[in-house]
UniProtKB/Swiss-Prot annotation:
UniProt keywords, alphabetically: Cell projection, Coiled coil, Cytoplasm, DNA-binding, Immunity, Innate immunity, Isopeptide bond, Metal-binding, Nucleus, Phosphoprotein, Repeat, Repressor, rRNA processing, Transcription, Transcription regulation, Ubl conjugation, Zinc, Zinc-finger
Gene: LYAR
Main location: nucleus
Zinc finger (C2HC LYAR-type): 1-26, 28-52
UniProt binding sites for Zn(2+) 2: C33, C36, H48, C51
Binding positions for Zn(2+) 1 per the UniProt entry: C6, C9, H21, C25
Coiled coil: 175-219
Protein name: Cell growth-regulating nucleolar protein
Record function comment: Plays a role in the maintenance of the appropriate processing of 47S/45S pre-rRNA to 32S/30S pre-rRNAs and their subsequent processing to produce 18S and 28S rRNAs. Also acts at the level of transcription regulation. Along with PRMT5, binds the gamma-globin (HBG1/HBG2) promoter and represses its expression. In neuroblastoma cells, may also repress the expression of oxidative stress genes, including CHAC1, HMOX1, SLC7A11, ULBP1 and SNORD41 that encodes a small nucleolar RNA. Preferentially binds to a DNA motif containing 5'-GGTTAT-3'.
Induction per the UniProt record: Induced by MYCN. Induced by interferon-beta.
PANTHER family listed in its UniProt record: CELL GROWTH-REGULATING NUCLEOLAR PROTEIN (PTHR13100:SF10), CELL GROWTH-REGULATING NUCLEOLAR PROTEIN LYAR (PTHR13100)
Length: 379
């Protein structure tokens, strides 16, 4: 976008706003460009479409600015607009619009963007006029490439000396040349894709080769193992060629046998320890059994027979030993069950069944009295 300064009032104005500023500032006769400093009298500012950049301004004498592709296309587009204004078959409304468009340096080159730009910048909302303007542009753009092709064609057909030489060249060389030309024409992306595909193919081929080699190496090993197994089953000795493999298999078997023997020994030791621990526990429990009162004869209830358990007698004996013939249910239960396990050889009943029997014996027997969490012996 080009900016000007008014020489009369000194205000900076955009190129689009110059006409509005002239109607306000009556003494405005000359405008000077802010970037390049040139003076423009009257309507000469309309031809000043583009100015130098800051790099060109402050770059020095030897500076050469880079030409951008977009700028070249934009300049060609604006030139096309100025050529369309000179056409005789253009309506006056469209011509006025084209003159306004030529003052801008950022005219879009696609239909949708061009029409939106016309609506926003030039305030033209009539779609028929917009379509007319765009049709003129499209006709001009389509006619240009045809003219260029006609100019590029030679007037007289010139004999091609390479054609005669190519007929003598063999077909293989011609194919190579065509392939080389095709490779040159390809983009960087296509080349990259081809390289990646080649790498993938090479990797797949290497994997297949490695897999085949591994399978070949594994097959003879399996056969050797099968032969050894057959020979061992038949009672024959393994040949000297396969002696190392046979020794390994024998060593493995010996190790397995020794490991199984050790496990058996360890298991037997553990069982012995458990049995000894059980015996010591039973002895301790027998020591804790209630003793007979001094000078008195033992009661029939307190001497249970081996194998059967006397619930009533054991409970009575434990309560007699307790102070005031009274003990908590928890302690009583613990002592009674301990006595039960020592007396009975085989534990056929579960702990839940034993607890049910214990509760029945306490609650239903009149000699025992329950006081909250305690049991008392009634004399």
């Amino acid at each position: 976008m080009v900016f000007f300064t008014c020489n009369a009032c000194g205000e900076s104005v955009k190129k689009i706003q110059v006409e509005k500023h002239v109607s306000v500032c009556r003494n405005c006769e000359c405008l000077s460009c802010i970037d390049c400093g040139k003076d423009f009298w009257g309507d000469d500012y309309k031809n000043h479409v583009k100015c130098i950049s800051e790099d060109q301004k402050y770059g020095g004498k030897g500076y050469e600015g880079k030409t951008h592709k977009g700028d070249i296309k934009q300049q060609a587009w604006i030139q096309k607009i100025s050529e369309l204004i000179k056409r005789p078959n253009v309506s006056p409304k469209v011509r006025e619009l084209l003159e306004q468009i030529s003052a801008f340096d950022n005219v879009p080159r696609k239909k949708a963007k061009f029409q939106n730009w016309m609506k926003n910048s030039l305030k033209v909302h009539n779609e028929s006029i917009l379509d007319q303007v765009w049709n003129i542009f499209s006709e001009a753009s389509n006619s240009e490439p045809v003219n260029k092709e006609q100019d590029q064609r030679p007037l007289h057909p010139v004999a091609n000396p390479h054609a005669e030489i190519s007929t003598k060249v063999p077909a293989s060389k011609v194919k190579d040349a065509v392939e080389q030309q095709g490779e040159v024409k390809k983009n960087k992306r296509e080349r990259k894709e081809e390289r990646q595909k080649k790498r993938k193919r090479e990797k797949k081929e290497l994997k297949l080769e490695n897999h085949q080699e591994n399978s070949r190496n594994q097959k003879p090993k399996k056969r050797k193992k099968g032969q050894e197994a057959d020979l061992e089953a038949g009672g024959e000795e393994v040949p000297e060629a396969n002696g190392s493999a046979g020794k390994r298999s024998k060593k493995k078997k010996q190790r397995k046998d020794s490991a199984s023997e050790e496990e058996a020994r360890v298991g037997a030791g553990k069982r012995k320890r458990r049995h000894s621990e059980v015996e010591t526990d039973s002895k301790k429990k027998k020591m804790k059994l209630p003793e007979h009162p001094e000078g008195g004869e033992p009661e029939d209830d307190e001497a249970p027979a081996k194998g059967k358990f006397n619930w009533k007698g054991t409970i009575k004996a434990i309560l007699k030993q307790a102070p005031d013939n009274e003990i908590t249910i928890k302690k009583l239960r613990k002592k009674v069950l301990a006595q039960y396990y020592t007396v009975t050889d085989e534990h056929h009943r579960s702990e839940e069944e034993l607890l049910v029997i214990f509760n029945k014996k306490i609650s239903k027997n009149p000699t025992f009295k329950l006081l909250k969490d305690k049991v008392k012996l009634v004399k």
